[in-house]
Amino acid sequence: MAEYQNFFNQVQVAGAPEMGLKEDVDTFERTPAGMFNILGWMGNAQIGPIYLGIAGTVSLAFGAAWFFTIGVWYWYQAGFDPFIFMRDLFFFSLEPPPAEYGLAIAPLKQGGVWQIASLFMAISVIAWWVRVYTRADQLGMGKHMAWAFLSAIWLWSVLGFWRPILMGSWSVAPPYGIFSHLDWTNQFSLDHGNLFYNPFHGLSIAALYGSALLFAMHGATILAVTRFGGERELEQIVDRGTASERAALFWRWTMGFNATMEGIHRWAIWMAVMVTLTGGIGILLSGTVVDNWYVWAQVHGYAPVTP
């Protein structure tokens, strides 16, 4: 029997664009908006209005400078040969300064370009966080997205800033490159006695898997009750209807209890935030507090002690 599953199908309503809040605000800085059916396959069919402001403009400018700096270095490594540039693009790498430079400013070809690119990236990321915070504040929203983003910034800053400072050298920071970044990650684990024995790494992976599981469960649940209006979650939160009642009953039948239409989002944000929060702690402790996680695990009784 044919059934509306809603895995790939979507309903698009094309009307006048929603321009957002207009009361007591200047809208001259907002771009126009329009409807695009192809965009509607993934989300809302409307694109715009877009507001960058000072923080957004600074973020995009310095983000572009970071990207351009790395690209110029790759172009230099390719000998200014477009064929070699395209062929070896994934193999090129912008490396941090060698250990002998410590935390000092290095010559351009000895890691100075990496330091410049990292400065551009830091300004871009911080400015974007400011933009996320101020946009939420201007809309009268909670700052949940800014604080969640800050957790990701924590892991990023530990890798490229806090841990190198504690270790006394920029050389321990990751490079900018596709395969070189993967090699750095593998070598990091080898240098510190197998990262799998780092309990904070384990917590991070558990939260990562948990985030994927929660996302799949929540997405499947809402799609399963869209025929009853379940996608209108705000309405279901304040006035529980048959959609949320059926979804809740399904999970009580399945595993004995259920989240609420509001609570599942609290589960999701904390599970996602814990991925980068605990991951950053685990990275920060590696080499600064614990040199070898396998030996640490042996001492604490959960890794085998080989004779």
From Swiss-Prot:
TM regions (residue ranges): 52-78, 110-139, 142-167, 197-225, 259-285
Compartment(s) where it occurs, according to its Swiss-Prot or TrEMBL record: Cellular chromatophore membrane
Biological process (GO), any one: photosynthetic electron transport in photosystem II
Residues binding a ubiquinone: W251
Gene3D superfamilies the UniProt entry points to: Photosystem II protein D1-like
Record: residues binding (7R,8Z)-bacteriochlorophyll b: H181, H201
Residues engaged in binding Fe cation: H218, E233, H265
Gene Ontology molecular function terms on file: bacteriochlorophyll binding; electron transporter, transferring electrons within the cyclic electron transport pathway of photosynthesis activity; metal ion binding
Bilayer topology: Multi-pass membrane protein
Keyword Ion transport: no
Keywords carried by this UniProt record: Bacteriochlorophyll, Chlorophyll, Chromophore, Electron transport, Iron, Magnesium, Membrane, Metal-binding, Photosynthesis, Reaction center, Transmembrane, Transmembrane helix, Transport
GO CC entries: plasma membrane light-harvesting complex; plasma membrane-derived chromatophore membrane
Record carries keyword Ribonucleoprotein: no
Annotated family: Belongs to the reaction center PufL/M/PsbA/D family.
Job of this protein: The reaction center is a membrane-bound complex that mediates the initial photochemical event in the electron transfer process of photosynthesis.
Subunit architecture: Reaction center is composed of four bacteriochlorophylls, two bacteriopheophytins, two ubiquinones, one iron, and three highly hydrophobic polypeptide chains (designated L, M, and H).
Protein name: Reaction center protein M chain
Organism name: Rhodobacter capsulatus
Encoding gene per record: pufM
